[in-house]
């Protein structure tokens, strides 16, 4: 070999590992990749000669390592750089012919006085936008964007904000201002995922793409404090990170130089610094694990937990019920479930802490409790007392209420150990041992990551290989490579696994320490090597953006970080084209609009899923559920075949068929038939080329705490808002007290009273509401009672008029049966018995008032005619088959009117007595007069005085 050839070889070897090429567009997250897009090509290395592109594509400067590419025709285009040396990888770019050309841009202002957010929206063209718009830094639209938005508005464009979870819609109520629309939405934490949508309006044959955004309460980064010192991982270690499962834009990254905190996917960030007097220099450089929680950033350093928050930097130990040392690991939730059904009191945990022998669960406000010890686990799992059992890992599963515990078990712990798996449910408090056992070297380190699925599924990896368990541990094995083995290090220059990334679509990225990436999908057995995107020496980490796309974060040598969008699906398509991997079906659809459904008594959920596939392949949809067996299913399948393709549609109805009436253990039966069920749809065959692996959603059977009832026509508006007192006459009270009752009318609780003439009958109309507003009128039976004990009212229907065959339940009879209970608990759905059967109850007096009301029986409340009064009623749904919730509401009625005149007979009697008394007095006075007259007729009343003679 000549000296020149040796020099060339050495040059090539020095460049090997750093020579690569990539591409980008002006559209964020590669959302528009079409014939209209400008594709920027970039070669990183020193051996570049020129670009090789097909004839249908045009390169601005073919001999420049950095240039622009446009492809005028859609399809798959082979692009690669020509270099001096071994050929570089050829990519197959899928260029679309799309009429989606424009994007939405938004800015947000927060108003804490009324907890709203003002979203300013405009349309922009990525091919003609200002640099600030492309970088996401623009505060106002550019001239081109103003013109575009104004033109679109003239054609009828008006964006709205759709919330993904609660399906609410917000629109602009203002006129357009300088090419922008302004939309006000409320701040929320449980409906943060939103989408900007526009009308189907075109300009120059182009539409605006819908845009997914994440809006929560404003999040702040922890500020840097002068004089504080950096905290980092050990020198030379790989990057570690943690993020909020429901707000992926909020994340923390630990490098061997600094720790960075962000709330906007690292578009901006702050460095985390700690006081100089708490940790030594070695401790500050010894971060082993990190967790981002709502209370702050939790660091694990030398077996001790520390937390950095806005309040400072403190050590966590005995003050929060945690060990002061010996902690071996911490973990947090990976998947976001905003809604879930938790029957037990309390909160679910947000992260786990463990030592070799103990597990602690933590929730918000740094509340920790010990969950279990290995000694207790030996008893629970019936393991040998003499065997060695230690806690290997604790990981949250894809289920919102379950935690997986990996246990190391051995009797003679010299060479190998067995790894067992048990799952703990935070709601039922039950431990379930799984059909999972793995033999491993005694000193091996394995890392688990559960998938987003209804049935438990996970990936478990060591330095070189990945072990998969899908479909509740029934589909297992080692992830294979095209080389026929499962050792990923052999295909990545002996590098070891650094990160395993899984998204909600089932994509799996295995990143090696040298940035070689392997790609797989859940429910598949193999992985393929993707094109090199980042050079071997750059320290990188893969994150998920708020739009559901992936991006790389690079830690640079100068102590800063940088982000770069990663076109995962374009890269996967390129490899699939090379390997001729095809999805076995053409389309997989469903109408599951939510990820969380509530089913109450008497309700059913009907959904459908459809698969389109080539003839003679026999595909179908698999429906799987996980959780308590509390739901019944009905299936209906329809099939169509045309033009060589088959369409199979499966319609499912989930329901309950339980009668809760006349059962002795009402509450126990309710509890047995409530719970959380996870359901997933997946095709019977699958490959890495398929877009979505499966559809996962929850069905919660039980009481929706956002459901309530109210009485139609009653509100807290339309009256003077004030509390006042009034007196109830003791004779009007049910329990007959010895004195009158003075009560206070609490307006904030009772609302405005309805004023009725006491000649008017009243039938309450009960309405059902949830957090979205009015749902329907309630047709079920309900009862009412006056909360202060008044019983001077009645009902117009008798038991006989209502169709009773025996004596119905009344407040009087129920109080007699349940004297030990307060009034509001003596009668309810748990002890309700109807009166429409001869087999139940006793005949009794059917002329009594019927005290049960519904919307159709015409039963009304009527009032006493002799006096007015204030009545505060509580209404309760009585039907035991209506709801799992104890639905009650309050309303107040004030009666008024003229006191009615007495009857004619009473008046006549009174007048007769009065006349009789008058004539009696008259006669008596007559006889008295005559007696006096007769006595003095001859004798004057006043005798004259005679004068005496003087002697």
Curated annotation (Swiss-Prot):
Superkingdom of source: Eukaryota
Cytoplasmic side: 925-951
GO biological process: flagellated sperm motility; sperm capacitation
One Pfam family in the UniProt entry: CATSPERE_Ig-like
Family: Belongs to the CATSPERD family.
Name of encoding gene: CATSPERE
Extracellular side, ranges: 20-903
Disulfide bonds: 57-71, 101-206, 246-336, 410-413, 583-690, 703-885, 719-752, 804-835
Residues that span the membrane, as ranges: 904-924
UniProt keyword Hydrolase present: no
Topology relative to the membrane: Single-pass type I membrane protein
Annotated glycosylation sites: 61, 114, 414, 472, 487, 493, 535, 796, 854, 881, 886
Subunit-level organization: Component of the CatSper complex or CatSpermasome composed of the core pore-forming members CATSPER1, CATSPER2, CATSPER3 and CATSPER4 as well as auxiliary members CATSPERB, CATSPERG, CATSPERD, CATSPERE, CATSPERZ, C2CD6/CATSPERT, TMEM249, TMEM262 and EFCAB9. HSPA1 may be an additional auxiliary complex member. The core complex members CATSPER1, CATSPER2, CATSPER3 and CATSPER4 form a heterotetrameric channel.
Protein's name according to its UniProt entry: Cation channel sperm-associated auxiliary subunit epsilon
Keyword Transmembrane (UniProt): yes
